[in-house]
Amino acid sequence: MTMESGAENQQSGDAAVTEAENQQMTVQAQPQIATLAQVSMPAAHATSSAPTVTLVQLPNGQTVQVHGVIQAAQPSVIQSPQVQTVQISTIAESEDSQESVDSVTDSQKRREILSRRPSYRKILNDLSSDAPGVPRIEEEKSEEETSAPAITTVTVPTPIYQTSSGQYIAITQGGAIQLANNGTDGVQGLQTLTMTNAAATQPGTTILQYAQTTDGQQILVPSNQVVVQAASGDVQTYQIRTAPTSTIAPGVVMASSPALPTQPAEEAARKREVRLMKNREAARECRRKKKEYVKCLENRVAVLENQNKTLIEELKALKDLYCHKSD
């Protein structure tokens, strides 16, 4: 019992000493703890972890376990402003996409406005709608509308030709030839001259056909000639030349009179004759002047030769005279 009580007294004494030392260490460490507490304030919001245990050796040689007040540095919970940067870049991309969509919409609207403008063919049709006998040009349609073939009706006017004598010749589609004098008004009072149509023949053959006048007379003429009887009773023959189908469209007939040349050809021939006549006159005058000049030169040479002979004779006479005086 005595040993047990002694041990208890010793343990109680050691405990009292330990408590006193702990109090002294606590008093000495208060400024540091306060400082550490001040330093560790920003990390108060960090996640809780187990406190670190530090072994402290006292001056009397005892070792005490002290719970560390300074906590380990925790990873910062402050997020970097990358999220905001990503947000800004996303907004910029969305604005670019919106601008591209707007540009595509504007280009589509511009194409629609251009497609609504009237084409040149439509303007030409509007201008030529009032002119009689002018075929209308169908406006180009889209591919959807061109599925069905469009048929255009073209009205071909009756060709009317005027000869150099003042007569009018109208050739209808049926093959009839109508004649009118210069005094008639328009197409009224035309004399109809019907010609029988000949069948297709080989090239190089001559076809004769009957031409019936208004008074009932029939005249046998070649197929490429037309006989015209004027009001005065004169009968004139006109030759009709048909050009090949490759150069002129079918239905176009060229009428010409071999006996009466056209006015431009006569004017050109007259000008050519005048030019040739002037050239001949100029050449004749040039030759005449050349002959006169040659004659003038020949006369001058003859005069100079005579003068030279005279001077030679005078020189001889002077020499003879000088020789006699010296003797």
UniProtKB/Swiss-Prot annotation:
Residues 87-146 form the KID domain. Residues 297-318 are annotated as: Leucine-zipper. The keyword Hydrolase does not apply. One of its GO terms (cellular component) is nucleoplasm. Residues 270-295 are annotated as: Basic motif. It is found in: Nucleus. One of its GO terms (molecular function) is histone acetyltransferase binding. GO terms for biological process: axonogenesis; cAMP/PKA signal transduction; cellular response to fatty acid; cellular response to forskolin; cellular response to hepatocyte growth factor stimulus; cellular response to insulin-like growth factor stimulus; cellular response to leukemia inhibitory factor; cellular response to nerve growth factor stimulus. Stimulated by phosphorylation. Phosphorylation of both Ser-119 and Ser-128 in the SCN regulates the activity of CREB and participates in circadian rhythm generation. Phosphorylation of Ser-119 allows CREBBP binding. In liver, phosphorylation is induced by fasting or glucagon in a circadian fashion. CREBL2 positively regulates phosphorylation at Ser-119 thereby stimulating CREB1 transcriptional activity. Phosphorylated upon calcium influx by CaMK4 and CaMK2 on Ser-119. CaMK4 is much more potent than CaMK2 in activating CREB. Phosphorylated by CaMK2 on Ser-128. PROSITE patterns: BZIP, BZIP_BASIC, KID. The keyword Transferase does not apply. Keywords: Activator, Biological rhythms, Chromosomal rearrangement, Differentiation, DNA-binding, Host-virus interaction, Isopeptide bond, Nucleus, Phosphoprotein, Transcription, Transcription regulation, Ubl conjugation. Its main location: nucleus. There is a cross-link at residue 122 (Glycyl lysine isopeptide (Lys-Gly) (interchain with G-Cter in SUMO2)). There is a cross-link at residues 271, 290 (Glycyl lysine isopeptide (Lys-Gly) (interchain with G-Cter in SUMO1)). The record marks 300 as: Required for binding TORCs. It holds the Pfam family bZIP_1. Residues 269-327 form the bZIP domain. Residues 1-26, 94-113, 125-148 are annotated as: Disordered. The modification Phosphoserine is found at residues 119, 128, 257. Interacts with PPRC1. Binds DNA as a dimer. This dimer is stabilized by magnesium ions. Interacts, through the bZIP domain, with the coactivators CRTC1/TORC1, CRTC2/TORC2 and CRTC3/TORC3. When phosphorylated on Ser-119, binds CREBBP. Interacts with CREBL2; regulates CREB1 phosphorylation, stability and transcriptional activity. Interacts (phosphorylated form) with TOX3. Interacts with ARRB1. Binds to HIPK2. Interacts with SGK1. Interacts with TSSK4; this interaction facilitates phosphorylation on Ser-119. Forms a complex with KMT2A and CREBBP. (Microbial infection) Interacts with hepatitis B virus/HBV protein X. It is linked to Angiomatoid fibrous histiocytoma: A distinct variant of malignant fibrous histiocytoma that typically occurs in children and adolescents and is manifest by nodular subcutaneous growth. Characteristic microscopic features include lobulated sheets of histiocyte-like cells intimately associated with areas of hemorrhage and cystic pseudovascular spaces, as well as a striking cuffing of inflammatory cells, mimicking a lymph node metastasis. Phosphorylation-dependent transcription factor that stimulates transcription upon binding to the DNA cAMP response element (CRE), a sequence present in many viral and cellular promoters. Transcription activation is enhanced by the TORC coactivators which act independently of Ser-119 phosphorylation. Involved in different cellular processes including the synchronization of circadian rhythmicity and the differentiation of adipose cells. Regulates the expression of apoptotic and inflammatory response factors in cardiomyocytes in response to ERFE-mediated activation of AKT signaling. Belongs to the bZIP family. This is Cyclic AMP-responsive element-binding protein 1. It comes from Homo sapiens.
